[in-house]
């Protein structure tokens, strides 16, 4: 434990430039990247304010209205979700309901296009 206490004392005495150099050396030695943690540590309280400005990476595909071609929408919901006929029909009739949750932007856009082509109204959240 005495060795760990000495390491902590030595690290506490480093300047900001020395700490940055240490970080780079450790990244090279261990083959990792500390980009996000360093940015959060450097930004401090500003990180919380910047969080809403970050681009979302996960989206929910929400069916808001089945439209006039409900059968086509049910077919697309089944294809997207893998649900059975009854479950897909119940989901479509209970709109607004999420069809897929936590999907990538590319997948969300693809699912939205498929559902809209079938006659549904869809939102991405």
From Swiss-Prot:
A GO cellular component entry from the record: cytosolic large ribosomal subunit
Biological process per Gene Ontology, one example term: translation
Matching InterPro entries: Ribosomal_bL12, Ribosomal_bL12_C, Ribosomal_bL12_C/ClpS-like, Ribosomal_bL12_oligo, Ribosomal_bL12_oligo_N_sf
Gene3D superfamilies membership: 3.30.1390.10, Single helix bin
UniProt keyword list: Ribonucleoprotein, Ribosomal protein
Annotated disulfide bonds: none
GO-annotated molecular function: mRNA binding; structural constituent of ribosome
Similarity comment: family membership: Belongs to the bacterial ribosomal protein bL12 family.
NCBIfam families per UniProt: L12
Quaternary structure, from the entry: Homodimer. Part of the ribosomal stalk of the 50S ribosomal subunit. Forms a multimeric L10(L12)X complex, where L10 forms an elongated spine to which 2 to 4 L12 dimers bind in a sequential fashion. Binds GTP-bound translation factors.
Role played: Forms part of the ribosomal stalk which helps the ribosome interact with GTP-bound translation factors. Is thus essential for accurate translation.
PANTHER family (alphabetical): 39S RIBOSOMAL PROTEIN L12, LARGE RIBOSOMAL SUBUNIT PROTEIN BL12M
Annotated HAMAP family: Ribosomal_bL12 (MF_00368)
Protein name, per record: Large ribosomal subunit protein bL12
Species: Mesorhizobium japonicum (strain LMG 29417 / CECT 9101 / MAFF 303099)
Gene of this entry: rplL
């Amino acid at each position: 434990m005495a060795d760990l206490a000495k390491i902590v004392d030595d690290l506490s005495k480093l300047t900001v430039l020395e700490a940055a150099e240490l970080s780079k050396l450790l990244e090279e030695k261990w083959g990792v990247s500390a980009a996000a943690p360093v940015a959060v540590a450097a930004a401090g309280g500003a990180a919380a304010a910047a969080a809403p400005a970050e681009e979302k990476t996960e989206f929910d595909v929400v069916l808001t209205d089945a439209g006039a071609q409900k059968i086509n929408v049910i077919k697309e919901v089944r294809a997207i979700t893998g649900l059975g006929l009854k479950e897909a029909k119940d989901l479509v009739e209970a709109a607004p309901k999420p069809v897929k949750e936590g999907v990538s932007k590319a997948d969300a856009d693809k699912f939205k296009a498929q559902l809209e082509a079938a006659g549904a109204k869809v939102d991405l959240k």
